[in-house]
Every structure is written in C-alpha cells, then in structure tokens.
Amino acid sequence: MTYQAKPARFDAMPYRFCGKSGLKLPAISLGLWHNFGDATPLASQRQMLRTAFDAGITHFDLANNYGPPYGSAEINFGEHLRRDFRPYRDQLVISSKAGWDMWPGPYGTGGGSRKHVLASLDQSLQRMGLDYVDIFYSHRFDPDTPLEETMGALASAVQQGKALYVGISSYSASKTREAAALLKSMGVRPLIHQPSYSLLNRWIEDDLLDALDDTGMGCIAFSALAQGLLTDKYLNGTPRDARINRPGGGSFKPDFLSEANLKHVRALNDLAQARGQSLAQMAIAWVLRDARVTSALIGASSAAQITELAGALSQLSFSAGELQAIDQHAVEGGINLWHKPSTDQRP
C-alpha cells in the first residue's frame, strides 16, 4: 500500500532555528546509528521511519559507517526513501557523516583527509540514491590532519552542491571555534555541532555550548538516553534482549551498569514519575531545556519507542526545584565513548 503521511504531522512538533541559520530542525530527530542495518528487518525499519515522520520528525541522521555492517543503514534508508519518502524529500532534512573507519586501506580508516571525507560523501550519496544531503558532518576531530584540510573538504561539499550545510561532531570547544573560523574564511558558514549529551554525560556544559552560541552554530545532542541506560530497561536488571547482549552491541559497555550509575538512574526515574513522565521522556525534555540545544537525537528499536519519546514534548518545562533535584543525580557516569576526539586526542 502506498504510504500517505498524516496531514497533521507537523502540528504537535516544535521546530527550532538551528543556531543563527534560517534552517529549523524538529525538537526530536531520529538517528539511524543502530537498528537500521541488515540485522533489523526492513519492515520494522519502515514502520519506525513512518511513525517518526507522522509525528513530525523531519530529520533523519545517518553516517557512512552505520549498520551493521558498515554502509547498510544508508543502503536500507535509500530503499525506504525510494518506496515511501521520495514525494516528501523537500520536507526532510537528511544528514550523513565521515571520519570513522569505513573501508580497507590507508584512505578508508577514517580521519579528516580531503581524500577520505569527499570519497565518503560520494559513497553515501550513491548508497542513499541522493544528489545531495542537507547536512554533512566531519564525524570526529583528526589530530593527524590539518584542520584546514578537513574544513576545506566540507566547504567543497557545499560548493559542489553535494551538501546544503556542514557541521562537526565530537569536537572540543577550542577546535569548534577554529573550525568555525576556517569555514567562514572559505565562505561557508558552519551550521551545527553534534555532541554526546545526557543526564549522565554533561561535558558540553563546560564550554562547548558557549562556543556554539558565540559562533552561531546549532546543537543536536546524540545519545541523549545514554544508549538506553536512561530508560526503564535496566531498572530491574539486564533484559535478555538488551543491546549489551546482542551482536554489534559493543558500544554499550558493562561498566555503564555500575551500581553507582544504576543508583542515580533509579533516583532519576523516581523524579520522572513524579512529573508524570517516563525516565526516557524526562531525559529528552531535560536535554532540550537549554535553548542552545536545537534538537535531541533519539535512537529506537521499535515504532512504539518513537511514540513514547515523542510524548516528551507534552511537558518540556521544569521548575527550579525539579532541576535542583535532578542535578543531585545528573552526574558524570563514565559513559562518554567519544571523550578522546572531544578533547583533541587520537581515538
């Protein structure tokens, strides 16, 4: 049956300007990092994408190496785009990234060289069946490549018509400022930064948000649910179907489930219940409490999860007392897998 998007899909979704640009992003965006590779049935993926778009989620975020295996998320998304979303292309913001390991040999092992970045973009466009992406990111800072070379590659992507906007991900505040200045000198304004940010990973509050404000860049926070830790999944032990028990679940480390972390998670869950929200809904609302955060990037393994998370939008405000109580448990949890590139180090 031909997909027909819901006519009222935009009504309940807040759309925020991305930094000082004219582009608006939905308050909640859908990331395809997990659950859109070949291990997930296409029918399940299709249901998730339809549910998201019908809820007003107009931004789908990918990267060249999303899967598993690498590249499969983009291939599968291209199929869904062809079958369901081609008539809605101009209502979508589609992004991809390059910078992590992708293909064999010295030019595919990641980084920020012009060779790797632009070859990756061409491959991504081919996999998705697109002429351009709306946003193209440098996926990580590369200390082995001059920043001017990496930003030059991003500028070329815009100048060649292969990307409308460019951004960076997991860059430190100082490198963000440098990157923004370089791009502006090349006639391309940096649009957005994509850092990890959650109740248990607050590093961007130190100086990155200020850097984004100063440079006019938006912020889309990924891993806002700490890869599922900030949901009800682990409140009473580890379920059998948890990512930590699945092939390809290596990004979720056993250390994340420390007793200290679980103690804070349970306390945060109690605070969420008092607000009439699930823990996941409160975690999303909390990330969005700062106006400098344009969008919260969610992952999901089912359409029902997307519907639940979209429910966070019904209560985005917090009282001063709630924020004070949350701060007692919104502490560093040792879950930032992207700490090294975010501090200018080699991964």
Language-model segments: residues:
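Short, well-ordered coil/turn segments that N-cap beta-strands
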Residues: 23-28, 56-58, 86-92, 130-134, ...
